[in-house]
Amino acid sequence: MRYVASYLLAALGGNSSPSAKDIKKILDSVGIEADDDRLNKVISELHGKNIEDVIAQGIGKLASVPAGGAVAVSAAPGSAAPAAGSAPAAAEEKKEEKKEESEESDDDMGFGLFD
């Protein structure tokens, strides 16, 4: 990620085609040593591509990754209709408890790092 960030920083700073030397200079400025193999891989993958298009594609891919922020929020207790009763509220609490347990097992966001 540090190589991609450095590449983007150089590209957004006006360097349309950052070299390994440019990226190493950025990384050295914050005390990070560069791995030449990874650095060359990032440069070869991003060389000649429009950075804005790459960012847009990345945002599209991230949109499909579950973030856990879409949890349903129940209405305030006083605003519920009187006919609703307490049975649906109890069912919601049970669902929320089950959901919390399953979220712990999904810490890898749907994909494993070492698969």
From Swiss-Prot:
Acetylation among keywords: yes
Pfam families in alphabetical order: Ribosomal_60s (PF00428)
One record GO biological process: cytoplasmic translational elongation
UniProt entry keywords in alphabetical sequence: Acetylation, Phosphoprotein, Ribonucleoprotein, Ribosomal protein
Compositionally biased spans, kind Low complexity: 76-90
N6-succinyllysine modifications at: K21
Modified residues (N-acetylmethionine): M1
Keyword Chloroplast: no
Residues that bear Phosphoserine: S17, S19, S79, S86, S102, S105
Compositionally biased tracts (Basic and acidic residues): 91-101
Disordered as annotated region, ranges: 76-115
Transmembrane segment boundaries: none
Segments forming a coiled coil: none
Gene Ontology cellular component list: cytosolic large ribosomal subunit
Chain positions with N6-acetyllysine modification: K21
GO molecular function: structural constituent of ribosome
Quaternary structure and partners: Heterodimer with RPLP1 at the lateral ribosomal stalk of the large ribosomal subunit.
Family to which this protein belongs: Belongs to the eukaryotic ribosomal protein P1/P2 family.
Main function: Plays an important role in the elongation step of protein synthesis.
Protein name: Large ribosomal subunit protein P2
Organism (species): Bos taurus
